[in-house]
Amino acid sequence: NGLEITVVEQRGLPLVAFGLMLRAGAATDPRALPGLASFTAQMLTEGTATRSSQEIAAAFEFLGARLSADAGREFTLLATETMAKHWPTALELVADLVKHPTFPEHELERVRREQLTDLRRGKDDPTVVAEHVTPGLVFSPDTGYGHPIVGTEAALGALTRDDVTDHFRRAYGPGSATL
């Protein structure tokens, strides 16, 4: 199916860490919706065809596993760490997130509120301000590099569930992924 798999073995601890990296980073954001890749990554953990966001969190917690879903400039990474005996189940959970996301509207609104709050809080932190301003000073806004990865208040306020599902359909798939 085109999924590239890379394995690095390190013996010593009964842990498995794996990441599903997809070429779906902020560079793929449409010019009018900076932050769409980041928002889509956050929404992956908010519901699938068979699990609610609470059930997803509970399943990872039951395994003692950690999960993060974040977009960078080039890639989106779903990173997981769990006990070695639980890695097949954790991998099945991650597969469910990227194969059957539902992007529930009520979760979308909650995530939007949280991200807008984070953006507003960041205005008081010089480091965060620099991270948001620098891309636009270095790169043209016509590229996928001239905006902050997390987007802008205007874009976050404007994006819709259709935007998220369209981005997911365009940017996610085994051909754009490395495990």
Over which residues does each language-model region extend?
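Charge-rich, well-structured scaffold segments of protease-associated domains
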Residues: L3-T6, E55-L179
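Active/ligand-binding-proximal structured segments within catalytic/core domains
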Residues: G2, R11-F60, E92, T134
